[in-house]
Amino acid sequence: MVITLGELIVEFVSNEIDCGLKKITTFSGPFPSGAPAIFINQASKVGAKTKIYGSIGNDIFGESLINRLKNDGVDTTDIQKLEGMSTGTAHVSYFSDKSRVFIFHIEGSAAEQVTLSNLPKEPFMLHISCASVGIDSVRKNLLDLCSYTIRNGGKICCDPNMRKELAGSPEIKKILIKVLNISGTRRTVARRLR
């Protein structure tokens, strides 16, 4: 089994190249998104048994996220649906040179509220999207979850892709280095972060 945790959001993509999110234009979406959700959805599509931990608002965006994950075979039983909070969102615009700019609306949304329950008893692969380390509730649970995974005979893999829009404090950098070193899969990246 492969498990992950982190932000569950929907994404809106500008239909206009080079708008830079600075002017009124049209967008496509909402697309189910968030690095952990994108990863786990793809893992499920290629046949892995998968599960994700995270939170959504009790709204249409959250419903579309859950439906997409469920339809693709992801175990969503431990996704919390939170009353009084909305599902997180992101807006993205692409540029002619293929770069992109993001605006995330995660702070104050359900995407910030990640709790862990019903962890598998059998060994599992824990996938960590480093973009999620910017979220307090993920960061607070992460090292304990890594220890549990290793003690339980599991493995850890990391996506070292960290969005500058989500990285803030030196604490985030320290946790990233620890997680990358624990995983053993991205030691070169961890050395570069120092």
Where are each of the predicted segments found?
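Ribokinase/PfkB-type carbohydrate-kinase core domain
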Residues: M1-L5, K70, T76, S99-R194
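Alpha-helix N-cap/helix-start capping motif
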Residues: A37, D59, M85, G108, ...
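Structural motif
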Residues: Y53-I56, I79-L82, S129
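Short, basic and Ser/Thr-rich N-terminal targeting/leader segments
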Residues: V46, M85-G88
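Short beta-strand scaffold segments in enzyme catalytic cores
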Residues: T89-S93
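Conserved beta-strand edge residues that scaffold enzyme active sites
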Residues: G57-N58, E83, R163-K164
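Glycine-rich phosphate/adenosyl-contacting loop at the front of the ribokinase-like
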Residues: M1-V74
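A glycine-rich helix N-cap at a beta->alpha junction
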Residues: N67-M85, F95
